[in-house]
Amino acid sequence: MKKISRKGFLKVAAAAAMSGVTASALAACNAGSSSSTAASAGEPIYTPGTYTGTATGIGEVKVTMTFSETAITDVVIDASNETESIGGVAAPTLKDALMAAQSTEIDNISGATITTNAVKKAAASCIEQAMGVHTAGGDTAASSSDEDWLGTEPEIDESKVAKTVDVDVAVVGCGIAGVAACRSVAEDGGLVAAFEKADGPQCRSGEYAVINGKVQAKWGRDTWTREQIDDIIDSHMVESTYRCKRSIMSKWAHNIGDAFDWWVEANPDLYYAETTRSAIPDENADNFIIPIFYPLPEHYDWKQERFPCYPTSVEFKPDQHVTVEANMQKAIDTGNVQTFYGCFVEKLIMENGRCVGLYARDAATGEYIKCNASKGVILSTGDYSQNTKMLKHFCPEVIENNIQCLFTNVDVEGNFTNQGDGIQLGMWAGAQVQQSHAPMIHHMGGGADLAGVGVMGNAGFLNLDLNGKRFMNEDLPGQQLENQIELQKNRESWQIFDSNWPEQLPYMPAAHGGACYYEDYASEDEGPKNNTTYRNYKSPYQLEAAVADGRAVKADTLEELVAKIYPDDTAAQQTALDSIQRYNELAKAGYDEDFHKPASRMWAVENGPFYADKFTTALLLVCIGGLESDEDCHTFDADRNVIPGLYVAGNIQGNRFATEYPIGLKGVSHSMAMYYGYVAGKNALKDI
């Protein structure tokens, strides 16, 4: 085996720290040299001292590590910005694990993966500093300007190009949109080069909005008329304050049924549940799909709602990775697809105003791949919600309100994948970015458990601010509810309800994150087999578990309840009692004079025991705002002329949403990503 120098060893060791390999294990690999094994025999490795590293989990995580010459002697983890009941609880265990492993080779803590990954990354930074080296893929230097979110297009040295690939279409990013694009091109006979900076196709969760089609026909939900579909499109335009393009929404709405049938075709083993809560056979537990809100709550009529949530959605369970990977495999099986995983596209190639290819860096070798794409390039690179500079520029309120990002996908260098690099690539090539971006921050209720499900979701029970005052019509969907919470003191409030909640839930709207079904189960084991309790369904055991965990407060009297939720503020306690009394009067009168909440969702809070759970700001799931586009997935220059050969799909496709994420169609972002990936593939190959 070839020996490596001590300098080389240290560099490799620091890089390995990022991926969890111990320094002593690396030293053992350098056999034949007494000095090379000194890591396990006491040779100095570190510069003694205390070092600090930071990384982003739910919020900023700080790790401070103290080193002797040969060991990590102390670890301090500051997870105060994490969810207290999740990341905060995990911190002591993570400290012990780092000390025991003497590296970042530690197991993830179930339910606290985001915090664990952040701690590992911050700890790796400490190790790098102590060893006096730096590895690629770290955070951008703090000294760079926050305004410099676009950066400068790199110059690629042709001498570093180790491989040249000639194809019809290059696809950048293998999420839902990119995978759909690959399959679309390949099945039409085009040659595809697929670039992805992670180690394979990427996806999260599994909700899709689907209008009509064979899949929806399985549940009799394929009966949407032209007029109803156009009403859905109108609602979307209103929610986006008419800052998006109707043509994009319309083409999707009228064609998604057939496209979704094509998508699930790739997964012939997919099991179709009869209802939202049907039992699932053991052999199908890892690959099934449910209709969301089927059957609908008995009192829900979307036609009568001020904020309708249309019964169009389905969800892949436990998530959609089986279907996404099946689609990618179906594309590869055509023989027309080359995949380049772990490769970072750094520059588009433009000739006479047309996009004709790209340069990508292979993370494994540091060398470049030049891809000539005769028909064009499809950008499907996702959003930018882990890029603080871009957030500050495009959605400053996300930063101002201290909204934390929920995103766990990482590239092969250990960094989050959603960095907005597609926007940078496109803008360097002359494309324009849309205005009025839409952060997805729909509230799912207070007192969330490890799965992110709130105690009663965002169901419209009474809500009081930190002074004990009522401040809104509580009959709001998650996004609008979040907007109201952000306006309150400390951006917090209390949801309050009484023991009659089981009778009241069926009157709540079937909407994003809201509890609207009651189930009388004593434990999850009593529920449908292999179909864990869905977020819109609530049973008494769940509420009592929330009380036991401290995620909800319970009291026999209202006086006791307000004393618990406002423990050091007697003025707030009295104001809260007055607010509840006023609310009860309005409920009994049948008309909400204060906030015009529908009488059908106003109930007096008067039968103990009483409950409360705290609302804080929700998490940012994705920040939707991309390059200006249209229903053919084109991009546009500063004069709004089409840029030939440059297409977009997924979150990088602009003008789908604007201002804020709409709540009328659960899973519409996934659905439009898949559909327009399909469209982009066909259009690129045909040069449309």
What is the predicted role of each segment?
Residues 1-20, 24-27:
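N-terminal secretory signal peptides and thylakoid transit peptides that target proteins
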Residues 41-141:
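Active-site- and interface-proximal helix/loop "cap" or "latch" segments in soluble metabolic
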Residues 169-193:
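N-terminal Rossmann-like FAD-binding beta1-loop-alpha1 element of flavoenzymes
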Residues 198-221:
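Conserved N-terminal glycine-rich FAD pyrophosphate-binding loop of Rossmann-like flavoproteins
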Residues 252-367, 388-389, 586-607:
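Conserved redox-cofactor binding core of oxidoreductases
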Residues 364-367, 371-446, 664-666, 670-679:
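Glycine-rich loop(s) and the adjacent beta-strand/alpha-helix scaffold that form part
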Residues 423, 429-564:
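An anion/pyrophosphate-binding glycine-rich loop and adjacent beta-alpha core
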Residues 571-660:
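A glycine-rich dinucleotide-binding beta-alpha-beta segment and adjacent secondary-structure elements
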